[in-house]
Amino acid sequence: EGVCLHVFMWNDRKNKYIKLKNRLVPQLELYNYLKYKLDKLADMIDIENYPHTGSANAGPCQKRLSAISLDDKWIGHFLDYAGDERILVKAGRFGKRLSTQTFEQVLYEAIMESLGYKNNKEQFKHLGTIASINDIKRLIPSDVSIQERSRKIQALLFGMSGLLPSQISRYKSAKDKYSHEYINDVEQIWSVIKNDIVNKPMGGELWSFKYSRPGNYPTRRIAAISRLLAENFETGIFRVILKSFDQRDNSKSGIEGTKAIIKNTESIFLELYDEYWSNYYIFGGRRLKNRERLIGKERSSVIFINIIVPVLLAYARKMNDTVLEERLFKAYKMHSRLSPNNIT
């Protein structure tokens, strides 16, 4: 009786009204008003901001999930029975991308997007496509130190993002000698690399520094992914993370072994430091009193749950790897619930 408007995606019957108890209710078809195709809109939904399971907002499957023994025989079917549609949807999307992309590229783009937080997700996602893993492998030498490799990747990603000082008209001159030396170095590297790049760099004005803690600025996040790529250059991020799930300590109990998987995987992100960006928030900014890691505990947890678990789930199902699927289930179920404030 309280219906005043009937809203749906497609109007199959083409009627402008429906009749309810002797009164006409107007209908609204949404399809003609969509700005993008449904597949693109689905990818744009920020699932990470959906409520996480908890006593105040748990869904109908949470009670059943909490009562499940980790040793139940159906555990290999993973989240089909666990009831977390959020993870399944993400795994499905990553699975679709795998039809045209490598596992390494899919994971790289997903991590990039996760580093973008609310205001820079699309920017980071685009950066991951115009400066792909193949581009990085092609342009960055492998026979150099991790630090030098990281700096070259930084030059590439900063240049393609449009965030280098030479690309920003309102850039203020560096305040100290070390910043001058660093900036000159990455600018010089970029001046050479850019000649071998086909894709057009982004505009620096597209990036948002508002409403973010300085430690979460795009510049710091680009430095973080650069270091991550540099440290795992030969093997690749995907294989390194996959290996952390394969190397469970058999001497430990099931619970302790799963905890070790979580700890070892998150440590890949928690132990990222850079000679420059662990001491600065922006190009030429004021030097920090204490060195800071590039990715904190909170963000590494978000990446573990929202990126690593669904990407590896897509991989496990593609490869029919029930052992990996079981380990993913156990790690997912054991992982402490993410903070309600996990998105900045």
Where are these predicted regions, by residue range?
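Internal, well-ordered alpha/beta segment that forms a basic, Gly-enriched binding/recognition surface
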Residues: 7-142
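Short hydrophobic-acidic sequence motifs that mark active-site Asp/Glu residues
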Residues: 4
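Hydrophobic, aromatic-lined core segments that form the binding pocket/scaffold
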Residues: 82-343
